[in-house]
Amino acid sequence: VQHALDESPRVLFDRGMDTPAAPFPERLTEGYRAFLDDRFDREKSRYEELADGQTPKIMLIGCCDSRVSPEIIFDARPGEMFVARNVANLVPPFSPDDTLHGTSAALEYAVQALRVEHIVVLGHGRCGGIRAFADDTQQPLSPGDFIGKWITLIGPAAQRSGGRGRNENFDDYVERLCLASIQQSLANLRTFPCVQILEGKGRLQLHGAYFAVATGVLMLLDPASGQFVPAVGEMPKKVQMIRCDEPG
């Protein structure tokens, strides 16, 4: 480790005279030690291979939510998935303008440079970003209202799903909207020319998935029916109640 540090470039910056040095979180240091002693030791040859580059076959677009880690859910090895995470696992439509596009940049790199064969949009239950959109009493968290602007991308999904039903429970509406937003993100993916071309040639496949945090159930979007079905096993009774296309 010291040898690597000796070869690393020295980067200097001004912290500001009044900013005290913050200690690195001990939890992360402990986790890193555990990683070195266990996973890195077991997969050292894999990491040595990855030093020369990555060749993932799957891009996964997920939520920033700390409860939903794609690498853990899918038991992925290093280098298997190219993961992009944002609030509410949203994909904006293709928009070639001069503004900054983090998710679109990740998509471009995955499709054009890495040549991934699959793109998965992974949503999850009780998503805070979806709840914020559904709750019209929410106030901006800052003057910039970055989240508020970002989650306007959910609008078309809400319109397509018919909005909240008159007698629909709020939590059920949020879950239904979570499913509908996955479908909307898939539709937005198909507005990107590179995705259109490669999917049309059969070299790229798009998938929608939904993870229930409390139960660990994974649901997959069935393109034929437009409904979400269990990846393994039987459909839970609660999920059967939640449809993404019909208000209660």
Briefly describe each language-model feature range.
Residues 3:
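Cationic, low-complexity basic patches in intrinsically disordered or flexible, solvent-exposed regions
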Residues 54-71:
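Conserved H-X4-D acyltransferase segment
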Residues 8-12, 16-56, 89-117, 128-248:
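Divalent-metal-activated hydrolytic enzyme cores
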